[in-house]
């Protein structure tokens, strides 16, 4: 293979590595915790990552203490835990 062909192959492999989604093993451990509304009685809409479906879902947070699988926005949840962009809640 010529040096130009090798360079092209290297470039394509590098691009593929950059565009390939992060594997589940690279998610923060708290992404695998269940949704936890906490023991308080507030009614705060939040999102949690559901590792079984690879989606961020809505839940109602009570305000304290809960766990770290608790995000103010769907985008924050998806970016942190690597959820699928499909099935965005309305």
Curated annotation (Swiss-Prot):
* Molecular-function annotations in GO: serine-type endopeptidase inhibitor activity
Q: Where is this site: Reactive bond for trypsin?
A: 41-42
Residues recorded as bearing Pyrrolidone carboxylic acid in the entry: 25
Identify the Gene3D superfamilies for this entry: Pancreatic trypsin inhibitor Kunitz domain (4.10.410.10)
Family, according to the entry, reads as follows: Belongs to the venom Kunitz-type family.
- Which InterPro entries does this one have? Kunitz_BPTI, Kunitz_BPTI_sf, Prtase_inh_Kunz-CS, TFPI/VKTCI-like
Q: Where in the cell is it found?
A: Secreted
Tissue-wise expression: Expressed by the venom gland.
GO terms under cellular component: extracellular space
Among CDD domains, the record links this protein to: Kunitz_PPTI-like
Main role? Serine protease inhibitor that principally inhibits trypsin (Ki=0.34 nM). Also inhibits alpha-chymotrypsin (Ki=270 nM), plasmin, plasma and pancreatic kallikrein.
Q: One short Pfam family name for this protein? A: Kunitz_BPTI
Q: Which residues form the signal peptide?
A: 1-24
The alphabetical list of record keywords is: Disulfide bond, Protease inhibitor, Pyrrolidone carboxylic acid, Secreted, Serine protease inhibitor, Signal
Protein name listed in UniProt: Kunitz-type serine protease inhibitor 1
Locate the BPTI/Kunitz inhibitor domain: which residues? 31-81
The principal location of this protein is secreted
| Disulfide bond entries | 31-81, 40-64, 56-77
Prosegment location in residue numbers: 86-90
């Amino acid at each position: 293979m010529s040096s130009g062909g090798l360079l092209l192959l290297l470039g394509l492999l590098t691009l593929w590595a950059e565009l390939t989604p992060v594997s589940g093993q690279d998610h923060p451990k708290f992404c695998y915790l269940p949704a936890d509304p906490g023991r308080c009685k507030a009614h705060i809409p939040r999102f949690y990552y559901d590792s079984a479906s690879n989606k961020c879902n809505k839940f109602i947070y009570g305000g304290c203490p809960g766990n770290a699988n608790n995000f103010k926005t769907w985008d924050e949840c998806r970016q942190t835990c690597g959820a699928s962009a499909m099935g965005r809640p309305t």
